[in-house]
């Protein structure tokens, strides 16, 4: 029993795991879209149980469990990663995404884990831009710099649109 779990104002992370029993393995198979549907069903059940147990509405963070936690097929993680906004909209809770150095990145770009820094950063920026509220990373400094640059670029894009009369908001 962990005493910190009993703290009422402590947020919890609920992570999806395709394999229900034992240690995670690379044996779970299925179609990529089944991964997204499975994550959605798992989270719906988790949120329902959380609320029935009296959990605070804002006390749960959802983690789709990227990589082999979903499936050994890289397409499954790619499908979930490309649909984060759909998950977030359906569930209305914050998302935590952990894609740093995951095997599905290596399978996609054809590189070993030690060389996945750029692919990890690209996947992390994609996740942030598509609904992830939290990102677990192996390179926090690189991610912070990339976020700062992206935010600065977005400000310039907005300012340029406004200056040209393209901003109708």
Each language-model region and where it sits:
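Active-site-adjacent loop and "lid" segments of alpha/beta metabolic enzymes
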Residues: 1-2, 12-53, 58, 68-169
């Amino acid at each position: 029993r962990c005493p910190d779990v009993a703290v009422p104002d402590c947020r919890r992370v609920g992570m999806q795991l395709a394999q229900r029993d034992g240690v995670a393995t690379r044996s779970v198979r299925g179609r990529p879209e089944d991964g997204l549907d499975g994550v959605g069903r798992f989270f719906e059940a988790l949120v329902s149980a959380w609320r029935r147990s009296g959990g605070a509405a804002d006390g749960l963070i959802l983690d789709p469990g990227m990589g082999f936690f979903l499936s050994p097929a890289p397409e499954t993680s790619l499908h979930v990663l490309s649909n984060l906004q759909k998950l977030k909209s359906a569930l209305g809770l914050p998302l935590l995404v952990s894609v740093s150095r995951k095997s599905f990145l290596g399978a996609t770009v054809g590189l070993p884990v030690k060389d996945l820094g750029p692919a990890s950063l690209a996947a992390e920026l994609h996740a942030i831009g598509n609904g992830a509220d939290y990102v677990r990373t192996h390179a926090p400094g690189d991610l912070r710099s990339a976020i700062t640059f992206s935010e600065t670029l977005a400000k310039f894009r907005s300012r340029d649109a406004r200056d040209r009369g393209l901003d109708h908001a």
